[in-house]
Amino acid sequence: MSVRLVLAKGREKSLLRRHPWVFSGAVARMEGKASLGETIDIVDHQGKWLARGAYSPASQIRARVWTFDPSESIDIAFFSRRLQQAQKWRDWLAQKDGLDSYRLIAGESDGLPGITIDRFGNFLVLQLLSAGAEYQRAALISALQTLYPECSIYDRSDVAVRKKEGMELTQGPVTGELPPALLPIEEHGMKLLVDIQHGHKTGYYLDQRDSRLATRRYVENKRVLNCFSYTGGFAVSALMGGCSQVVSVDTSQEALDIARQNVELNKLDLSKAEFVRDDVFKLLRTYRDRGEKFDVIVMDPPKFVENKSQLMGACRGYKDINMLAIQLLNEGGILLTFSCSGLMTSDLFQKIIADAAIDAGRDVQFIEQFRQAADHPVIATYPEGLYLKGFACRVM
């Protein structure tokens, strides 16, 4: 008999709506013992079967659902089916947009909670973020090896969230070749170097692909400030769009060095690109005090909020940094501003920008809205999957 997680009375509604998480407060009891990440059955208070998921006793998310089909086992064949389903959509996108790199698996939205897989050329970069994902590591890798024999697999599960589920951080080659120090990929006509082994996340922010392309229509003959530039994707796109100058700011000299290489790799005019190692908050104030002005500002900060207790502080941070950006823009200038914090809703983010404009003493018009690229889908039953949001704002 399988181990069962029994829900408290009335707590089955989210599962009936096919939401993939069971929170600790919804659990009445466990029937049997399960190890960390083991597959369990989830039943309502009367014993009616609801789902099959992965058990995580140390997490507030006590179980993550693998399947709502009682006949479906969680094995190599299961992972192969999920991967093939996900690949169909990526194949269409890759052909349509000429991509050699994309997100293959976007966790819950692809039916594989806690699993992220990015493909960069013939390298699959894996992040296992939950106990269930780690428990199924061998089955997942076996499925990947069968479906993608041409690909090497590299593990970037060096993510702090694993500690919340009682797991160590892991990183390194799994199968095949070690990724080169910098792997070239292509995106909308740009050549970009990706640091799989040491870069942020899996090496590159594929989710901003569409936003980087959209930037080009705003920058012709404009002076651009690229904040939190990382390896310069927005900077290269701005130069390809014909900007007169782009200033890229980041705290990491290593990232700025790669950004410079990316400009050179695309045979763009390096004299139009400036790379500044500094704290963005501090530098924006310095620019304001000096009377510096820009025509376009890209504001793409890291996540400011990890949990609900940090949300108010994050709101203040987003408001402050966008206020400073608005103050630095010429009349008619464009602010391209983003938040990758999942707890920050699009409506709240828009309100923060509006409040920032009031504090800056300027009017803004919202002219375009952004979200994560289409290889980062959001399944209807899991709205939390929509984490990246952004706006193009015209500053009056």
From Swiss-Prot:
Role summary: Specifically methylates the cytosine at position 1962 (m5C1962) of 23S rRNA. Methylation occurs before assembly of 23S rRNA into 50S subunits.
Enzyme class per UniProt: transferase
Catalyzed reaction equations: cytidine(1962) in 23S rRNA + S-adenosyl-L-methionine = 5-methylcytidine(1962) in 23S rRNA + S-adenosyl-L-homocysteine + H(+)
EC number: 2.1.1.191
Parts forming coiled coils: none
GO cellular component, one term: cytosol
GO MF annotations, alphabetized: protein homodimerization activity; RNA binding; rRNA (cytosine) methyltransferase activity; rRNA (cytosine-C5-)-methyltransferase activity
SMART domains: PUA
Residue intervals of the PUA domain: 2-81
Family: Belongs to the methyltransferase superfamily. RlmI family.
Record's keyword terms, sorted: Cytoplasm, Methyltransferase, RNA-binding, rRNA processing, S-adenosyl-L-methionine, Transferase
Protein name: Ribosomal RNA large subunit methyltransferase I
Keyword Transport: no
Superkingdom of the source species: Bacteria
Subunit and interaction comment: Homodimer.
PANTHER family, per the entry: RIBOSOMAL RNA LARGE SUBUNIT METHYLTRANSFERASE (PTHR42873), S-ADENOSYLMETHIONINE-DEPENDENT METHYLTRANSFERASE DOMAIN-CONTAINING PROTEIN (PTHR42873:SF1)
CDD domains with a match to the protein in the record: AdoMet_MTases, PUA_RlmI, RlmI_M_like
Keyword RNA-binding applies: yes
